[in-house]
Amino acid sequence: NYIAYEALAGRKGAVGVYNYETGEVLCMVSTPAFDPLNPPSAEELEENDAYEGAYLNRFLSGTFTPGSVYKTVTLAAAIENVPDLYDRTWTCTGSTTVGDGAVTCPYAHGEQDIYAALSNSCNGVFALLADELGEDVLARYTEKAGLTASYSVNGIRTAAGSFDLDGLTANELGWAGVGQYNDLVNPCALMVYMG
């Protein structure tokens, strides 16, 4: 726990490590935090922003935007629903039009197949795939991945993830397919999914 706490270096966040074979949680850290043997006064808690959320266990109760990890959900859906996926190539210029707007990448990846798109974490390719797959398919794979589930950790229920994909525009669905837009996932659920 100490190494995880130090790695967070005062930033707000959570770290969890578990044995994927047994489900045993080996490490669970949430910051900000304080020494329970020397707690801050009520006045310090109120006046010092460093303690904001100190009573919240972000690993259990928090939800966060998953970011590019969610591309693995979009990829799983595409593998099973896009028959010519492995024969396609895309050209990333750093900005891809999806619906009525742009989905941007920090780099222009050039021409790439699905392997390169995953390796490069190309927002444009995964946004196009998300749009092609549609709301229902992405919602089904998100649920299959367990990202909307609440898990029990020693009898304490985690927050459930939230992926409201109904009625999105093509551009919004594209951003959701790369783990942005209004996607929210609990760190424990993400840990279980990736394990």
List the predicted regions and their residue ranges:
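Conserved, well-ordered alpha-helix/loop/beta-strand core segments that scaffold catalytic motifs
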Residues: 1-14
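Beta-lactam-recognizing serine transpeptidase/beta-lactamase-like catalytic domain environment
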Residues: 20-68, 73-195
